[in-house]
Amino acid sequence: MSAAGRALERIERILDHGGDADGVLRDVVAVLHSDYSWVGISFVEEGELVLGPALGEQAVQPTRIPISYENKVVAELGVIADEIDARDRVFLERVAVLIGPYCLVGWDTGGEAWSP
């Protein structure tokens, strides 16, 4: 199994175990950091991106992957590596889909209850 496949399995286990959104996202960032020199999740708050959980040193601009919930961008996954190839992008886009429900900081549910 590829490194991305192993990381995806670990992330799926984290999501299956559940917990509060902050803890889940920190654990996902830690898994990704084993393969990328910097990983961070930025949340859309009042139209601005605000950095949340992150690991590593952000020496250059990261590759950014939008994180959506109900077809609206709610956050962004950023990673830095020597090289990001097409396989990395597919993997990171899959991770973004999986963690979308955990990235609803400031999300207006209109009073409706929600759970990831």
Segments the model singles out, each with a brief description of its role:
Residues 42, 66-68, 80:
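Core beta-strand residues in small-molecule sensory/regulatory alpha/beta domains
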